């Protein structure tokens, strides 16, 4: 499995710009639009195919920001950036080529210009590493014919993430998946997102450690943990700072971790 992971930097037209808190839908539109520019067939296939699309992306971040009270957006300054990851070369090639072909980008009414696309290095090891979300993790299950959001306080959360990883492993490798996977939640913060007009999703910003089969964990790192990765959920980075901190405390003690931590840059 090849990891194709990119940091995409954009320069705003204005010194100060808005970024709505519910913005994954706009990034999804950008990704599909640029893929369509260079590979219309692939764009149609991704639109029509059900199940995991085998790519994920982060929230849109800024080098500096302010949070005006009572508004549905924050104010960004300097550069904006986001991360994109896939294991499918055709998807990576189409999206990145499309960005360079049309470097002027309009998102939620703000204009940006492509400044840099940087290929990121792959961590050497995954099992035992600490991860932090770059976009929140979404997990759902069906009960009585309805789908419900599942939280890390429920046992099903962990089993569903493992089964989701195994399904993606089969899609990518075409072979029986390993079953060895555990995750230890260090900190968590719930977030409710409007993924499309009138459609909401409860998801979780997490700091967690993952243990088990390195290749199975690698699947989550490459194409996302949990569900709805192609809608902007489940992207993580390895948190280098926490590698040096062994006794951080229990899940319950860490529920109020700094929500800005997930917006730091990294691999």
From Swiss-Prot:
Enzyme active site: 32, 47
Gene Ontology biological-process entries: defense response to virus
Catalytic EC class: hydrolase
Domain of life of the organism encoding this protein: Archaea
Site, as annotated: Transition state stabilizer: 53
KW Lipoprotein (keyword) present: no
Gene Ontology terms, MF aspect: endonuclease activity; RNA binding
Annotated family: Belongs to the CRISPR-associated protein Cas6/Cse3/CasE family.
Protein name: CRISPR-associated endoribonuclease Cas6
Primary gene name: cas6
């Amino acid at each position: 499995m090849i990891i194709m992971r990119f940091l995409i930097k954009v320069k705003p037209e204005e010194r100060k710009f808005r970024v709505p808190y519910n913005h994954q839908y706009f990034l999804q539109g950008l990704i599909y639009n640029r893929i369509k520019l260079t590979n219309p067939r692939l764009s149609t296939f991704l639109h029509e195919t059900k199940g995991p699309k085998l790519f994920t992306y982060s929230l849109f971040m800024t080098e500096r920001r302010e949070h005006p009270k009572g508004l549905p957006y924050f104010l960004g300054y300097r550069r904006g950036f986001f991360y994109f990851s896939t294991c499918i070369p055709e998807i990576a090639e189409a999206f990145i080529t499309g960005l360079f072909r049309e470097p002027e980008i309009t998102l939620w009414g703000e204009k940006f210009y492509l400044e840099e696309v940087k290929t990121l290095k792959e961590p050497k090891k995954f099992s035992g590493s600490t991860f932090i979300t770059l976009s929140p993790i979404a997990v759902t299950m069906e009960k009585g014919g309805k789908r419900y959001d599942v939280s890390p306080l429920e046992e099903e959360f962990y089993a569903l993430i493992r089964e989701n990883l195994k399904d993606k492993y089969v899609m990518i490798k075409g072979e029986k998946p390993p079953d060895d996977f555990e995750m230890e939640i260090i900190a968590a913060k719930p977030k409710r997102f409007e993924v499309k007009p009138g459609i909401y999703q409860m998801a979780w910003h997490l700091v967690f450690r993952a243990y088990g089969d390195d290749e199975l964990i690698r699947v989550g790192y490459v194409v996302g943990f949990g569900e709805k990765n192609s809608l902007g959920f489940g992207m993580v980075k390895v948190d280098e700072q926490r590698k040096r901190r062994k006794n951080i405390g229990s899940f319950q003690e860490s529920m109020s971790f700094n929500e800005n931590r997930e917006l730091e840059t990294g691999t």
